[in-house]
Swiss-Prot record:
HAMAP family: RNase_III (MF_00104). Pfam families: dsrm (PF00035), Ribonucleas_3_3 (PF14622). GO terms for cellular component: cytoplasm. Digests double-stranded RNA. Involved in the processing of primary rRNA transcript to yield the immediate precursors to the large and small rRNAs (23S and 16S). Processes some mRNAs, and tRNAs when they are encoded in the rRNA operon. Processes pre-crRNA and tracrRNA of type II CRISPR loci if present in the organism. Its main location: cytoplasm. Coiled coil: none annotated. One of its GO terms (molecular function) is metal ion binding. It is an enzyme of class 3 (hydrolase). This is Ribonuclease 3. One of its GO terms (biological process) is rRNA processing. InterPro entries: dsRBD_dom, RNase_III, RNase_III_dom, RNase_III_sf. The active site is at residues 44, 116.
Amino acid sequence: MSASLDRLERKLGYTFKNQDQMLLALTHRSYAGRNNERLEFLGDAILNFVVGEALFERFPQAREGQLSRLRARLVKGETLARLARGFDLGDYLRLGSGELKSGGFRRESILADALEALIGAIYQDADMQTARERILAWLTDEFDGLTLVDTNKDPKTRLQEFLQSRACELPRYEVVDIQGEPHCRTFFVECEVVLLNKKSRGQGVSRRIAEQVAAAAALIALGVENGND
């Protein structure tokens, strides 16, 4: 194993028995041959479970929607990319020449995906408990800074954070109708989310309120919230 990968292992706090697993986790799809997408898929599932389980234990009084919002914040691409930068992960990625020239080693989505792939690789190389220990160790500061007060955000913010955690496009809001007299108007808004086949709708005495109602409806349609949170 090269000295550089040895340094990365020290930063991660884990030494791979199978070096090929580590290399595969660091291989972007732009690189020739096999890539890290399958390991990323596995790592994403493990990450969501481990974080969800930890939140369930840490906040016994939290409602489902609150737990979902906290988890979305911890597993979103921005958080994972920040951790990856702390490991200097971009220095170890295997990228195709085009991606390399365009600065792919700094791109948030590539860094976040690679970290998820490393989680999947650690699970494959060791076991679930080892993967859990690494995830919780990496996220110690993030967990320590969490409170249920953090979940008191408006629906538009919660929807945006959820979509960002899934590396999805941000929602689009459109005023489709305005009814009533100028002093007593009702705004009708549609919210388009790429994960939903149908636009969610909201109405209110202002555009802002109508957008919040539409965002809340989208969160329910996505299964993130149940309407009672």
